Amino acid sequence: MITIDTSRKLGPIKPVHGVNNGPTSFGGLTDLSRSYKAAGFPYARMHDPEYPHPTAVDIPQIFPDFSADETDPANYVFENTDAALKAIVDCGTQIIYRLGTSIEHTVRKLYTDVPADMDKWARICIQIIRHYNEGWANGFHWNIRHWEIWNEPDLNQDDMWKGTPEDYFRLYVISSKAIKAAFPHLLVGGPALAYKMDFCRSFLEHIRRENAPLDFFSWHMYNNRIADFAARAADIRALLDANGYAQI
């Protein structure tokens, strides 16, 4: 039962109907932009685009040859991602860009390895941000503010992350510091937690010790019980506060 006290004014209700991805799929073969815009989605998080065969957003799709020169625009393939993001921008929705790769439920994993060179991976992220916010490589000036580092590195299987928790912590520290150094006005966060509260605790303790930036903490659940979501939110809030992130 929900009780509403109409005598109290608390201000505007925070919009909570954000979505994953945009109104188009498979290069525009499906385009739901009219309905998408009408829904007024405040945010679109870019993860698992065109699942299960993505051709956009993921770093391995944009920068397919990791051995190439990351400063050369010729080594980037932006076209599909440009189109996907433009459809979202045209609908008036803000983008949360997940830097990383899509989940792989296949037997053979292609892109969930730990980056061979984390510093270079961070530099690639910076070039992608420049493309969408500063016009680099025939890019745009979309002022995408939220940049999320990876997705679900806490999963048991290697569908999302083949490394250890410590490997992810290191990737987060390196890339978050590099991004904030290049773009101090942007928001960097993660880890897009799926399940494990012990991972959450260790992550927060580690980045606090390393003085790594955390502008937002991202998490989600696979559940249909509202009470469980509320309990998880309270648990994460307590961990954030205990580790000095009360401002998030």
Question: Where on the chain are the PLM-derived regions?
Answer:
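Non-catalytic accessory regions flanking glycosidase/transglycosidase catalytic cores in CAZymes
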Residues: 1-146, 166-190, 212, 241-246
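Extracytoplasmic/secreted cell-surface and envelope-processing proteins
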Residues: 28-29, 54, 105-109, 156-159, ...
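Short, glycine/charged-enriched secondary-structure capping and boundary segments
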Residues: 59-61, 110-112, 161-165, 202-205, ...
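Aromatic- and acid-rich polysaccharide-binding/catalytic face
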Residues: 97, 125, 143-151, 186, ...
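Short, glycine/serine-rich, charged loops/turns that create anion-binding
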Residues: 102, 154, 195
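Alpha-helix capping and helix-loop boundary segments enriched in small/acidic/polar residues
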Residues: 116, 162-167, 194, 224-227
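N-terminal/domain-start segments enriched in small and hydrophobic, helix-friendly residues
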Residues: 141, 147-151, 156-163
